[in-house]
Curated annotation (Swiss-Prot):
One of its GO terms (biological process) is succinyl-CoA metabolic process. Its EC number is 6.2.1.5. Substrate binds at residues 264, 321-323. ATP binds at residues 46, 53-55, 99, 102, 107. This is Succinate--CoA ligase [ADP-forming] subunit beta. Keywords: ATP-binding, Ligase, Magnesium, Metal-binding, Nucleotide-binding, Tricarboxylic acid cycle. Pathway: Carbohydrate metabolism; tricarboxylic acid cycle; succinate from succinyl-CoA (ligase route): step 1/1. GO terms for molecular function: ATP binding; magnesium ion binding; succinate-CoA ligase (ADP-forming) activity; succinate-CoA ligase (GDP-forming) activity.
């Protein structure tokens, strides 16, 4: 789960991280009133969307008067902001964060992430912070340093010293950086975050460090422990189909292809998407119905897939362990009778009650294309949509 910048800063401040502060606007009629509350010489108007690259896309504006700030805010509110992370459709700006500007001496990059390959928490830092960190990673990766934290021992003083040293901080600034590292680590662990990113972390002209922008992504599996964080979720920033799927207990991610997939198990789902690509087509989604899906959940899964207008065919790939193939078959038939399936449907079943499931589908009278293995299923669905 992602949250907005102003929410991320609120969390970081609770853990002792110094951040820039401002006011949030959620309605156009509140823009002037909100800006009037800020007494500053420089105003920074920031679009609040769940995507990076706002600065380059015009979603962050720095102005030097109240009048300019009001005009920029009114112009920015409600637009579709297109960045390299939103895709061509962009993301509608429904919130603004308006801050007081500050003097910047130098910008740095600092983040903490759970490294799944190394099975540990990893700090990532660079002396080249700001909007071009992606370019730094591509062209000059040697300017980016990493420190891994052994989960058995946790954060140690040498991690904090090492990060401060690699960023070139000395004396009081090194002390400040060590405290920021410690605070960010505590926030990361205690909130079950998947990533915390501060970009840029700046040195002000007075020598103090400040988090000028912040992003936090949380592990969805840990949200049940944090109702206060769950309450920060902005459904307007999420795909409606993904939200609908989550409410039904389904794992769904929309993609750009034209073949809808319904599978049980994340690994099998990824293998299914891979083989669709191998046979020359593209998956329209990732959809894992889970191991304990019932007839209604299967029915809802198919409805969600068919809600995507780009879907030209559906591949159902089920390996029945806990999940019974006859339940899948009944769900498919129920969905077909309820909403009608007007695109080619290929079904591959294996495992528990597979013969019963195949019999149910065969006797349904529906135009269902059976497949005996995954390669056969992928080949048949790709051929069916051509």
């Amino acid at each position: 789960m992602n949250i907005h910048e102003y929410q991320a800063k609120e969390i970081l401040r609770k853990y002792g991280v110094p951040t820039s502060t401002g006011l949030v606007v959620t309605k156009t009629e509140k823009i002037n009133e909100t800006i009037d509350k800020l007494n500053t010489e420089v105003y920074v108007v920031k679009a609040q969307i769940h995507a990076g690259g706002r600065g380059k896309a015009g979603g962050v504006k720095v102005v030097k008067s109240k009048e300019e700030a009001k005009k920029v805010a009114h112009d920015m509110f409600g637009i579709n902001l297109v960045t390299h992370q939103t895709g061509p459709q962009g993301q509608k700006v429904n919130r603004l964060y308006i801050e007081s500007g500050c003097d910047i001496l130098k910008e740095y990059y600092f983040s903490i992430v759970f490294d799944r390959l190394a099975s540990c928490i990893t700090f990532i830092a660079s002396t080249e912070g700001g909007v071009d960190i992606e370019e730094v990673a591509e062209k000059t990766p040697e300017k980016i340093v990493k420190f891994s934290v052994d989960p058995a021992t946790g954060l140690q003083d040498f991690h904090m010293r090492g990060i401060a040293y690699e960023l070139g901080f000395k004396d009081n600034q090194a002390k400040q950086m060590k405290e920021i590292v410690k605070s960010v680590y505590n926030a990361f662990v205690e909130t079950d975050a998947a990533q915390i990113e501060i970009n840029p972390l700046i040195v002000q002209t007075d020598g103090n460090l400040l988090a000028l922008d912040a992003k936090i992504t949380f592990d969805d599996n840990g949200l049940f422990k944090h109702p206060n964080i769950t309450a920060m979720r902005d459904h307007d920033e999420e795909d409606p189909l993904e939200t609908r799927a989550a409410n039904a207990g389904l794992s769904y991610v929309k993609m750009d292809g034209n073949i809808g997939c319904m599978v049980n198990g994340a690994g099998l789902a990824m293998a299914t998407m891979d083989i669709i690509k191998l046979y020359g087509a593209s998956p329209a989604n990732f959809l894992d119905v889970g191991g304990g899906a019932d007839r209604e959940r299967v029915k809802e899964a198919l409805k969600i897939i068919l809600s995507d207008k780009e879907v030209q065919g559906i591949l159902v790939n089920i390996f029945g362990g806990i999940m019974r193939c006859d339940i899948i078959a009944e769900g498919i038939i129920a969905a077909a009778k309820d909403i009608g399936i007007k695109v080619p449907l290929v079904v591959r079943l294996a495992g528990t009650n597979v013969e019963k499931g195949k019999e149910i589908l065969s006797n349904s009278g529906l135009e269902i294309i059976p497949a005996h293995d995954l390669a056969d299923a992928a080949n048949k669905i790709v051929e069916a949509i051509r």
